[in-house]
Amino acid sequence: MELAIILIIGFAILGVIIYFSMRAHNKMVSEGQIISRRTNFMENAEEFTLVLADPDQVTQAVNALDYHAIHTEMKASSQQQIFQFKGSSWTAQLRRLKEDRNQTLYRFEFTNWKTHNGMAQDALNMNRLTTAIEKAFLALDPDTQVRSVPLEFKTRHSIL
């Protein structure tokens, strides 16, 4: 009988935790802080094709992001259009791939991330950064085309 009561209380607590987690997630989605994504979204690069982008405007847009709120550091090489991002357990990069005719192609990808039980440890801030970068490109050119490209990556397993 005591075990049944403990299990009921445990499931009730778990239900409350899940409820508040989903509520917080839905609030961030409605506020535009994140986009609902698959749990393995970091395994894809995002490519942004936009009308000939002025590198200075891209640099300004990337510099204007609120990195403090995303718990992220950013280092930029404005001339080469390479931006490095570092979170608590991950790194990412945004760079200009090519510019031809009237289009510029940028690629954003996570280059390294740690997992726990198969899930990215800091997926929330990874999602926040991805969303912020997508919004920055759409603000520069509302007709920006966004394409997801699967990454080729290697996994290292820790014994401990």
What do the PLM-derived regions correspond to, one by one?
Residues 1-11:
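Feature marks short, highly hydrophobic, charge-poor N-terminal signal-anchor/signal peptide-like helices
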Residues 11-19:
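Alpha-helical transmembrane segments
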Residues 18, 23-46, 54-160:
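Ser/Thr-rich, low-complexity intrinsically disordered terminal regions
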